[in-house]
Amino acid sequence: HVSSRHRADEQASRRALESGRILYGGAGLASTAIIDYRSYTDHAENGDIHMIVHQFSTRARLRAANGHSDNQVMQVGGRWGFTEDSPDLGNIFREMDSWLMAIKNDDSDMDLSRKVVANKPLTLIEGCWDNSGETRAMIEEEQTFVANSRCNELYPAYPTPRIAAGASLANDVVSCRLRAPDSTDYEVTFTPEQSAQLDAVFLQGVCDWSLGDASLARHQGTWISFGPSPVNRLQ
């Protein structure tokens, strides 16, 4: 429990965004072949930080930076095995090898990011595994954060506290800019007393997520150095 609100260190937040320590969807990631393959641990008894919402945040950052996420393929509900009874990971490695070799052998004039998308194997499908029956089944569906789909039924994704408080799915704001609370922003109706209490709790204001990060930081490039060498160092 944290008894009072606190702010992240301003310089550390800015550096994290500028250096890509907080994942940026453009730059090198724009031309990277991405297979996001994971087991589902959102319902783990003691909780698990590896919630699948984060893969959708990555997808949102790719789309924000590049206008698409066609270089990313998601599969959920996999089993981490190489045997005939549990072939998931072995199959994924074969698909990745095929994808990377096709990119390497592409001698066209397209830039790398376009080559990555153009050479994605047709057999590398997006979907989820239904492990509920005697025979496992791959359900071929685009993976989405919220949808009326079989995969979302099997593997529901849950928002982070920040997303629940109004942040975008990209979840890429470290320190928000503040504005005065407005009771009309909420789905419930406040009494005058409750509105006064809301104002009293958030004396400094609440997040205005539409304004982006308070630092106004922008990604500076890949493999940036923190020094002391001046070579490729953060500005």
Q: Residue ranges of each PLM-predicted region?
A:
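C-terminal His-loop and adjacent cap/lid subdomain of alpha/beta-hydrolase
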Residues: 1-235
